[in-house]
């Protein structure tokens, strides 16, 4: 169960399965792990993997955040496939994407219903405070937004990139 997505990833996965006319009652834990394949968090990957078609990926964070809110509101989102591919296997309750910036793997988080629009800035401020207190932190950044003070992002600690590509750490 530790490898299965939490609230946000589970919501995206269930919406994807419904989109592709799959009965959720027929989907087993092993099916869900196969869908995660090698895109999950941490060191584990699952084979044989089952995948959904992948659409063009958008780099407009404000648009992705808006589409996350639609999904959280149980509304239709034309970006469901994209959001699933960017973060549907991630843990946690909050919407997020996993992406690459300058060849390095990052996680960028978006506010959920219970968060204010300044959630990203607040998390960034907490990370700055933790670093000032000499707490070891992954590299982090506040990504700009025209809709809110910004989106918190952190370099993934479970991946390492080099000339041969991205490798799992653990």
Put a short name on every predicted segment.
Residues 1-170:
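Phosphate/dinucleotide-binding and metal-coordinating scaffold of catalytic cores
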